[in-house]
From Swiss-Prot:
Homodimer and heterodimers. The keyword ATP-binding does not apply. Residues 1-89, 153-163 are cytoplasmic. It is found in: Cell membrane. It is a multi-pass membrane protein. GO terms for cellular component: plasma membrane. The lineage of its organism: Eukaryota, Viridiplantae, Streptophyta, Embryophyta, Tracheophyta. The chain crosses the membrane at residues 90-110, 132-152, 164-184. Keywords: Cell membrane, Membrane, Transmembrane, Transmembrane helix. Residues 111-131, 185 are extracellular. It holds the Pfam family LMBR1. This is CASP-like protein SELMODRAFT_413556.
Length: 185
């Protein structure tokens, strides 16, 4: 339950702070071009595997560079959207951290202690439902959705990391099995 909020907060912390100059952009692109050419020279199978890893890191670097140096006619708008996107990540990271702490408190107070010390979230949802019929259900849905998103975030980071057009089918099926296992009950 910690990976989702912490990854959002760290994404804000490691965001591009300002737009880089054209000279810096050209310098970094030249370095990335040299790295790409070097990784194209395939040799032994171990070299191929390290080349694939280098290409994945290179793609990440190119994406980070494109965020730091927006191009095109609407470069200012693109930079503003990038800044707002990282601020939204910070806000959702802080909210997620609060939800994680609440879930952990509920697990400790209600589930680990026998008999339960206090019906923490159960009582909160009942009180919200008595205030307005759909409020308790909505809060419960938000908490459940957050748990599923935490599972998805955690398994994408550690067990079998998933990348767009870079995940093997067996890794994808393993991740789907974990999500289905966590969503049943």
């Amino acid at each position: 339950m910690a990976t989702l909020p912490l990854s959002l907060i760290f994404a804000f912390k490691n965001r591009p702070k300002c737009v880089i100059t054209r000279a810096q952009y050209v310098k970094v692109m030249a370095w990335q071009e040299v790295t790409a050419k070097r990784s194209n020279e395939l040799g032994s199978p171990t070299r191929r595997k390290s080349s694939i890893q280098e290409l994945v890191f290179l793609e990440d670097d190119v994406q980070a560079l494109n965020e730091a140096f927006p191009q095109g006619e609407k470069a200012d708008t693109s930079w503003a959207v990038t800044v707002l996107f990282y601020l939204a990540k910070l806000v959702f990271g802080i909210l997620g951290l609060a939800l994680s702490i609440i879930w952990l408190l509920h697990i400790i107070v209600f589930m680990l202690v026998n008999p339960p010390a206090f019906p923490f979230l159960n009582q909160v949802f009942i009180q919200l439902d008595s205030a307005w019929g759909l409020l308790g259900t909505t809060a419960f849905a938000i908490f459940c959705y957050y748990l599923i998103m935490s599972v998805i975030s955690g398994e994408m980071h550690s067990i079998h990391p998933m990348k767009y057009q870079g995940t093997l089918m067996n890794s994808f099926l393993f991740n789907v099995a974990i999500i289905l296992l966590c969503s049943t009950r």
